[in-house]
């Protein structure tokens, strides 16, 4: 099951499949499918994960066994998304507000001084592009992430806010255009 959903959702599906005599494997796709296609990194978990990894490897795919319990592969993907998609949402909120306030260059300079190892304009343009192109799907995933975090007994504020930002940028319908940060910010702001 390669759906991007909460571990508890996968566990419920596994119970149904097992009751019918099937073998369920939790599969998480860990990077964009394009351009790697079938060579995209995969995590598999559950009691049949090793058997699935053997079959997937024979198909020239890139599986890695994440554990013997259904939900482990999905938990890794979901919790990684708190960070990856959350950084995208922080980028959008920070730089859209900075652009609207007329202080975008100063904010980027401050970020660059704090973290000189990151090319902030390029990374920010990339993060916005990912949200504009994939925001609707990522928002749905982030709602599953929020359910994962809640099931762990923790507040889901960051994940829920990330889902809202992903939805918001997707709903603008703005085309990413060239990888020019200022122009990309302007295209989004014009539609908010």
Each model region followed by its residue ranges:
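Rossmann-fold dinucleotide-binding core
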Residues: 4-85
